[in-house]
Design a protein with these regions (language model features):
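Rossmann-like dinucleotide-binding domain for NAD(H)/NADP(H)
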Residues: 72, 78-184
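Conserved anion/nucleotide-ligand pocket segment
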Residues: 1-10
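Short, structured coil segments at secondary-structure junctions
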Residues: 7, 26-27, 119-121
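A short, gly/pro- and small-residue-rich
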Residues: 11, 64-69, 142-146
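Rossmann-like adenosine-cofactor binding region
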Residues: 17-116
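The conserved SAM/SAH-binding core of class I Rossmann-like methyltransferase domains
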Residues: 14
Length: 184
């Protein structure tokens, strides 16, 4: 999303909630609350998903929501496979409503060999590698976060990047490092 404006794209961010007065990232035209998602879909040439797997996001992109997408749009999913109904996605691509899809995650995962998405020429499926955890820098960051959190834990302080068991999102912490994927 951060590089898309350099290619002439306008980026609209969608968040579960938007705090009044919260700054909009430089690369975004605007950030809207999730309640406005369906109004944005008919205008989007590319719908990029990086959602967590929560009860609220389960099949968030079902047949009805995929039908709201712009004719000829592309769906990209690098979050959790459970956010997209993959059979409905296969139908949307096969019918021509969506031009195609790029999926690093699927539901189920791995996708069965007889799943209809495999036979769609405009669908690219990668084996859950978009996070690039194999890069040395990424592994260094993971170790750095672990050591930082271990020190906090040993001191009896809340750790950073802790996922809430209630919301399934990252909750607060010590206020130190907040190395979290997604929009700030």
């Amino acid at each position: 999303a951060m590089r898309a404006p350099a290619l002439g794209a306008e980026v609209v961010g969608v968040r579960r909630s938007v705090r009044p007065g919260a700054p909009c990232p430089d690369y975004c035209l605007r950030v809207v609350p999730q309640s406005e998602l369906d109004a944005e879909l008919p205008q989007a040439d590319l719908v990029a998903l990086s959602l967590p797997g929560t009860p609220e996001t389960l099949h968030m992109f079902d047949a009805a929501r995929l039908a709201r997408c712009k004719q000829g749009a592309i769906l990209l999913n690098v979050g959790r496979g459970s956010t997209v109904d993959c059979l409905a996605l296969a139908d949307a691509v096969h019918s021509g409503h969506l031009f195609g899809a790029a999926l690093d995650v699927t539901d189920p995962e791995p996708l069965p060999s007889d799943h209809p998405l495999w036979s769609e020429p405009n669908v690219i499926i990668t084996p859950h590698i978009s996070g690039r955890f194999s890069l040395a820098k990424t592994l260094d960051n993971i170790v750095e976060i672990f050591i930082h959190n271990l020190k906090l834990y040993a001191a009896g302080q809340p750790v950073d990047n802790q996922v809430s068991r209630t919301t399934h999102y990252v909750s607060g912490g010590s206020g130190g490092q907040r190395l979290v994927c997604g929009m700030p």
